[in-house]
From Swiss-Prot:
Name this polypeptide is given: ATP-dependent RNA helicase DBP3
Source taxon at top rank: Eukaryota
One Gene Ontology biological process: endonucleolytic cleavage in ITS1 upstream of 5.8S rRNA from tricistronic rRNA transcript (SSU-rRNA, 5.8S rRNA, LSU-rRNA)
Gene name per UniProt: DBP3
Motif (Q motif): 175-201
Taxonomic source organism: Cryptococcus neoformans var. neoformans serotype D (strain JEC21 / ATCC MYA-565) (Filobasidiella neoformans)
Length: 605
């Protein structure tokens, strides 16, 4: 080989060839990725501008390189033969290698003509990578839950003033709604609230950190948003489930949040709140309950954007067992008013429903809210919750709302109830006149359906706009009566205990218990319809001591005493014995609250 050939086309070592080859591949891949991203519309204007500048730079470098090579050949051509005779070929080769190494490998950039066209397979991979990058960038817009971990003096004051107990004390309360680390699309909906309620402030940090929670708080404390905000936020970060439908049911794995409630009214109310909140991120909630046909509910479940289900245990289990409700991908489970559901005998249904969902090891987060913390609720929590944080607002014993003024009237004759009822209606409306802008709402409770019908007739005859809510009414009639009461078309509503718990009716100023309920728990929940969301209220209770009332007198007085209410002297004639709940196997127990000495055991010889 001549010296000219050696100079014109020097041989490169294997390492240098490999390095140049890798550099070219890297540049080509980088350029192709940027171009593909720009074509797909994923790249920003800055990336597109960078691609244009890079192309311009590549063309300029190519021209400079060619010009430099031409100049170098012209300069070296006269001395080629001399250099070949004076120096051995190996040294010349080495010298040329050294010259070529002066140009860094990293400057070897491919031109547009050198870039090979991407194959279909490469284009597919590139599109997939671009989509993943876009998803990552959109997910980055959702702030990760970063809740405070250190208790400050302000946190401790908040817990003490609201009588809150955290077991264990892992997460300080979140005192400002604006500090919520949630999807930015959800924040405007919450900005209309001034500050979180105590149960919300303590629940949100733990639930946003994906911990299981047991919340014990009075009715009307904002529990729906306490579990709803973290649940909807979690679903907004999960990808929607895609797939083919099974018959007339929904796409398998489509339902990701399930809320169980004890009554149709409470389920409907929670559904309305979650629907309004979920709309901000395109999530739809469906409410399922008995008393109406299943076909309409099954059609709603099959809609593409349905990812939240709120239902009563009976209908939920029915649809799950029939295969029309797939719960295999539920990642957020809520048991609302758990003690009420257990009291109503839904424990077996709840256990069977939970069996349709994934376990906590598969990532299911479980939330339980209750007004009390009895043994039955503790047992259920220990079975289905994973190391839960327990939040107690107030006492875990049965207690009434201290913001509600309690008035107890002991009546010798039950027939006096109608007269006293109309008296309190007239007195309350005189102080709080009804108007369209500020409607006055009065809730009257009866024990039985027939009594509710009679009271509705009595109140209407007295000249008041009144509606009713009881079990003999159709579901449509119940919805209409409830809506008329909420909007102020009817300012008096007569109800049985079917509406005593969980209903969020705004601004109920007065509750009248015409007949005392069968349990003190129901009494507390009846009264809880007023004095909600931090407001004050008033409850009037007629007590005759007949039938079941006498056995509940002791517990009733204990509840009144705990909230500092005045107990009429006429109550002294009733026994102070507190009857404990009846156990299925061991019957009822009694606790004597008097200071009388305990009986002495007598032994016979």
């Amino acid at each position: 080989m001549s010296a000219e050939e050696l100079v014109a086309s020097p041989k490169l070592s294997k390492e240098e060839k490999k390095a140049r080859k890798e550099a070219k591949k890297l540049k080509k891949a980088e350029k192709a990725a940027k171009e593909a991203a720009a074509q797909e519309g994923v790249a920003t204007e800055e990336v597109k501008e960078e691609v244009r500048k890079k192309d311009k730079k590549d063309k300029k470098e190519k021209k400079d390189k060619k010009r430099k090579e031409v100049d170098q050949e012209e300069a070296e051509s006269p001395s080629t033969s001399t250099a070949a005779t004076e120096e051995p070929p190996k040294k010349k080769k080495k010298s040329k290698d050294a010259d070529s190494s002066e140009t860094p490998v990293s400057t070897a950039t491919p031109t547009e003509s050198e870039t090979p066209a991407l194959s279909k397979k490469q284009q597919k991979k590139l599109a997939k990578a671009s989509a993943a990058a876009a998803a990552t960038s959109s997910a980055a817009a959702i702030p990760a839950p970063t809740v405070p971990t250190t208790f400050t003096a302000e946190h401790n004051t908040f817990l003490t003033s609201n009588n809150i107990t955290l077991t264990p004390s892992l997460f300080p309360p979140l005192l400002s709604i604006r500090d919520l680390p949630i999807n930015s699309k959800l924040q405007p909906f919450l900005n209309k609230f001034e500050k979180p309620t105590p149960i919300q402030a303590c629940s949100w940090p733990a639930l946003l950190s994906k911990k299981d929670v047991v919340g014990i708080a009075e009715t009307g404390s904002g529990k729906t948003l306490a579990f709803g905000v973290p649940g909807i936020n979690l679903l907004s970060q999960l990808p929607p489930v895609t797939g083919s439908k099974k018959g007339r049911g929904q796409v398998p794995g489509q339902i990701q949040m399930l809320v169980l409630a004890p009554t149709r009214e409470l389920a409907q109310q929670s559904h309305e709140h979650l629907s309004a909140f979920g709309e901000q991120v395109g999530l739809k909630s469906v409410c399922i309950f008995g008393g109406v046909g299943k076909d309409g509910q099954a059609r709603e479940l099959s809609q593409k954007d349905t990812r939240v289900v709120v239902g009563t245990p009976g209908r939920t289990l029915d649809l799950a067992d029939s295969g029309e409700l797939d719960l295999s991908s539920v990642s957020y489970l809520v048991l609302d008013e758990a003690d009420r559901m257990l009291d109503a005998g839904f424990e077996n249904d709840i256990r069977r429903i939970i069996a349709h969902t994934p376990g906590h090891k598969e990532g299911r987060q479980t939330v339980m809210f209750s007004a009390t913390w009895p043994e039955s609720v503790r047992r259920l929590a220990s079975t289905f919750l994973n190391n839960p944080l327990r939040i107690t607002v107030g006492s875990d014993e049965l207690s009434a709302n201290k913001r509600i003024e309690q008035i107890v009237e002991v009546l010798d004759n039950p027939r006096d109830k109608d007269f006293r009822l109309t008296h309190h209606l007239k007195a309350h409306l005189k102080v709080h006149p009804n108007s369209k802008t500020s409607p006055t709402r009065i809730l009257v409770f009866a024990l039985y359906k027939k009594e509710a019908q009679r009271l509705e007739y009595t109140i209407r005859r007295a000249g008041y706009a009144v509606g009713a809510l009881h079990g003999d009414m159709t579901q449509e009639a119940r919805f209409k009566a409830l809506e008329a009461f909420k909007t102020g078309q009817q300012n008096v509503l007569v109800a049985t205990d079917v509406a005593a718990r969980g209903l969020d009716i705004p601004d109920v100023g007065l509750v009248i218990n015409v007949t005392f309920p069968l349990t003190t728990e129901d009494f507390v929940h009846r009264c809880g319809r007023t004095g909600r969301a931090g407001k004050t209220g008033k409850a009037v209770t007629f007590f005759t001591g007949e039938n079941h009332e006498k056995s509940l007198a002791g517990e009733f007085m204990r509840v009144l005493r705990d909230v500092g209410a005045e107990i009429p002297k006429e109550m002294d004639r009733f026994p102070t014995t507190i009857k404990k709940k009846e156990h299925g196997s061991y019957g009822a127990f009694y606790k004597e609250t008097t200071n009388a000495p305990a009986p002495t055991k007598i032994t016979f010889d």
